Structures are given as structure tokens and as C-alpha cells.
Amino acid sequence: MMPELGNFLLCLAAGLALLLSVYPLWGAARQDRRLMALARPLACGLFACIGVAFLLLVHAFVVNDFTVRYVAENSNSALPVWYRVAATWGAHEGSLLLWVLLLSVWTFAVAIFSRRMPLDAVARVLAVMGMIAFGFLLFILFTSNPFSRGLPQYPIDGRDLNPLLQDIGMIFHPPILYMGYVGFSVAFAFAIASLLAGRLDTAWARWSRPWTQAAWMFLTLGIVLGSAWAYYELGWGGWWFWDPVENASFMPWLVGTALLHSLAVTEKRGSFRAWTVLLAIAAFSLCLLGTFLVRSGGLVSVHAFASDPSRGLFILVLLIVAIGGSLLLYALKGGRVRARVEHTLWSRESFLLGNNILLMAAMLVVLLGTLLPLVHKELGLGSISIGEPFFNTMFTALMAPFALLLGLGPLIRWRRDDVARQIKRLIIALLVTLSLSLALPWLLQDRITAMAVIGLMMALWVLIFALMEVHERATHRHGFWRGLRTLTRSQWGMVLGHVGVAVTVIGITFSQNYSVERDVRMRPGDSIDIHRYHFVFNGVRNIVGPNWTGGEGIIAVTRNGRPEATLYAEKRFYTASRMMMTEAAISGGLTRDLYAALGEELSDGSWAVRLYYKPFVRWIWYGGVLMALGGLCCMLDPRYRMRKKLQEAS
């Protein structure tokens, strides 16, 4: 009975989404307040229906209702209950329902927290989000219904959740990543609503900016969690593989970063209006493209869902309608929102525009490297592979000027500035950056490489100018310590975001240039030295888990004769799915990780063991967290609410 109720609620939600996409929009066109006022209750009803339907699917997993085909294919009675809950979004149908649930959450949030906006603006925004929800609900109901029964025959037990997904990271990574993905629908809806109204001003940017910051924050955290999961779960010792589906989340992040900075210019200076609208359309379009890539069945990826071509065709139609319709509207009405605001080449506007162009160029590089192999294969031209060297080379070339502009930009004045005013800062920053970039690799790793110096120069340049920015703002009217307390959340958010970029680049630089990897055969008692650390293999013991059995390799690590860590690398056999998995052992620290992965037992009784020394690898994720915190600070800045109150009072 519960699955049938879930089906009914999805049908009801589709009906509400259709009403939400029609009535408020019609009311806004006719200035009928009665029709526009329907937007908020319809949005709340949509959220309630999808929310309850999702809880019913979770309930089916928790109680092991194997009459539901999706549950039987992705769960098992021996699966721990928390993984049963995570299995709800572990495959195509459930993850798509999660996608729509989070879309309804964003729709509900806009309905609740936009009460100071004009009613016609809210009506248009919610109507656009209703259209998106309606399209995806149709997709679920016709091709991907998670409530489909397997009657009259159904299995006594389920196939089990993919062992790769039986990890604590998979409980949090997909929902947070999807919150970012779907969150850009709000920026998209604001952009389309503004085009429909023919009005795009600083108020539009101020309304849209906190929602964009929230979406960007969630997407940043989702990417960080996914990278960390790949690092410790896949057993390869890497944190980013330029996998097509990883790229599908990275592209909207790049465009979203450009959008955040462009919104700042539109809000404060009234310029970049048409460009900002185009970025909002592009960010959400890339989110839809990522959804298509994951579910089309055309990609080989550890992240891709096994899917039939009809599903990919349905999403492709949605993609064409959404992108084509929005670009057509932009072509028809984009000219009306353009604004001419004069500024010189040496101005903050020019620096932000330059960084926007570099971010879009980086996105196009990733898009080309992701889609070209797929297009090449579909055209019958054979298989080609675009790998890490291409992406790394192109990104380094683009990110060097990006870091240059990112560091200096916040210290440049709006509209125009004097180059001579910055000469002293430029000389100091250049000398400190160059000195530290040469000294740190030698002090920490005993050798210097050209790529390490380039990477550290990029990071330290951004970091030094971020500190200069804090000092200048704090001492503008007060003493330094008193001035720190006067900085706004938005200013702290910008500094945290830029420092986060620097910290991430430091982590990438050291881990890419100074990591050490060894693949060895080891018997109990064998040892090997890796970068000042002595690894001793103490054999393998049997272990048993809730739904798996396996072996645990014990590796003692010492440094200068003193115990440093004991690594317990596992090899697990999942009985339900009959799959063997590797669980890496990691001893983490602020400046280094020691990493071990247990391979197969060899014929002579020895074991294949992979050992890594990875310096500063965690800084990659620390920087991502700092960036997300920066987004949170900006999002919570009360100045937006204060401005609205002042406008209303006047």
C-alpha cells in the first residue's frame, strides 16, 4: 500500500508543479494578484507531496520491502540500516527522486524567505522552478519510477547495495552535491523571471546573490566530499581523476564562481547585467548536462548509473527545451537589460571581467575534454582518450593569470584606479612570493621543481594579497585590532574564499610534485623505506563485518626509530553481491598522509601492497572547506536585509 501511496503523491506533485508553472506566470502577465498569490501555497504543497513520497521510499528500504523492484535491486536484509537509508539514492531512480526533492526544498525556501520581494517577481521565479519540477516529475513517472512493484514474483532477499557506496561518505556526498546542483535552479529562475519582466537592476542582483552563494557553497562541499571519498575508498591514492562525471560537477562550479563575482559587479555598479544573466543560464544548463551525462548510459565512469538509452533521450529533450528556451528568451530580451557603465582598464570591474573570462575558458577546456571522446565514439570515429596531462597543462596555463588577477583585484578601486598606487604592494608581494616559493620546497621536501615553484607562487600571491586586503580594510578608519571587528561578513567571506583557493593550490602543488608511490611484494617481516618513513609488513589477519568477511593487513610505520603509525589495510568480500573490495588505510596529519592499500595474495605467500607518502594532501580539502565557509559568511551578511528595510521605509 505504501508504494501505491508514493505513486499517488508523485502524480499529485506533478499536477501541483503544472499549476505552479502556469497560474502565477499568467497572473504576473495580467497583474492579477489573486493568481500570483497562488505561487506560495502551490510551492509548499509541492514540497509536502515530494517530501512524503521520499520518506515512503526510505521506509521501503528500512523495512526491506523487496516487492518494490528498486529496493530489491539495491538493498539486502544484511545491510546495516544506515546504508539502507543511503541506498535510497544509491541508484538511478532514487537519486532522481532525491534530485526532485531537493528542487522542492529550494522552491519551498524561495516561497518562505522571499516575502520582501514584489509579488510578481516571486510569482515568476516560482513558476520557472515549477516548470523544472514538472519536467523531472514526468521523467520519473514515465521512465524511472522508484515505486514500481516486482509482483507477482519478487525475491526473498535483495541484490545488495554496490559495495563502493557502503561508506559513510556516500550518506552525505550525494545530498550535499545535489543541493548545489539543484540550487543553481534558483539563480536560473531569477534570471528567466527578470528576462520575462524585462527588468534587471541592482535589486535583482541583490535578491539572487544569497541564493547563488548558498548553491555554490553546497556544490563546493559536495565536490570536496566526493574528492575525499575517492581518495580513501577507491584505493588509488588519488583525489581527482578528471573523470567525466567529476567534470560534470566541476563545470557548474567554475561557472557558478564566475556568476558570484559577476553578481557582485551588477549589484554594486549596475554593469555586467546581460553577462550575469547568461552566466546564470549557463550554470544551471551545465547542471542539467551533468544529469544527462550520468544517466545517458554513454559514459564509462565509477559514478555513472547504468541506464537505458530511452532515459538518456528523455533527459536530452529536457536539456534541449530548457537550454534552447532560455537562450531564445535571452536572444529576444537580453538586449533590453544591457547597461553601459564606464570603467577603465585598471579597475576592479576589469579585473573581475578578466577572471570571469578565464573561468569560462577553463570550463570550455573541461567541456571539450569531457565531450570530445563521447562525440568521437558516437560518430563512429573510434575511441579516443583525453587524460590527466591535457587537463593539468591547460589548467595550469589558465590558472596562473587567474591567480594574478584574483590576488590583486580586491585592492583595486571600482571604476578607475592609479597604477602607481599599487607599485609598492606589487613589489613587496612579488619579492615575498618568489622567496617563499623557492624556500618552502627546499625546507620541507629537500628539492625544488619548476612546477612546485609555479604552483606555490600562484597560491602565495593570492594569500599575501588576501592578508593585505584584511589589513587595508581594518586600518581604513580604526586601529588594526579594532578594525577587524568592523569587517562585514561579506568581507570576511571574500577573504576566506580567496584564502581557501590558496590553501587548496598549496595542497595540490605539494601532493602532485612530491608524492611517493611504491608497489611492492611483502611477506610478514618485510620492510621498505619511503621518504624518511620505515614501513614493516606484519602479516594479514582474518576479520568479519556485518555483511562481509575479509583480511586485514597490518603495517607498522616508524620514523627515526620511533613509532609513527599502524596502518590496517583491508580486503573485503561482500557475500550478497559476491564482490571483493579494497579499503585503504590512512594515517593523516596536517602536513602528510601515509597511505596503504592491500592487493591480492600471491602464489608464494606474499602480498601485493601499495604504499604512498602524500605531503599536504589534506590541504586540498581544507581549502575547499574554507571556500564553503566564505560562501556561508557572504550568504548570511545582514546588509541585504538592512537595505531592503531601508528601501521599504523610504
Positions of the model-derived regions?
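A conserved hydrophobic secondary-structure block that centers on an alpha-helix together
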Residues: 11-22, 28, 32, 95-227, ...
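Membrane-interface helix-boundary motifs at transmembrane edges
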Residues: 30-39, 113-125, 197-209, 267-275, ...
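Interfacial and helix-entry/exit segments of alpha-helical transmembrane bundles
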Residues: 39-48, 128-129, 203-225, 270-287, ...
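Short, aromatic-rich amphipathic segments at membrane interfaces
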Residues: 86-87, 162-167, 591-623
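Membrane-interface helix-loop-helix modules in multi-pass inner-membrane proteins
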Residues: 51-126, 132, 141-161, 223-267, ...
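Extended, hydrophobic alpha-helical segments in both membrane/secreted and soluble proteins
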Residues: 175, 182-192, 203-262, 275, ...
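Soluble non-transmembrane domains of integral membrane proteins
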Residues: 518-610
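Contiguous transmembrane helix-bundle modules in multi-pass membrane proteins
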Residues: 1-34, 50-52, 66-68, 244-254, ...
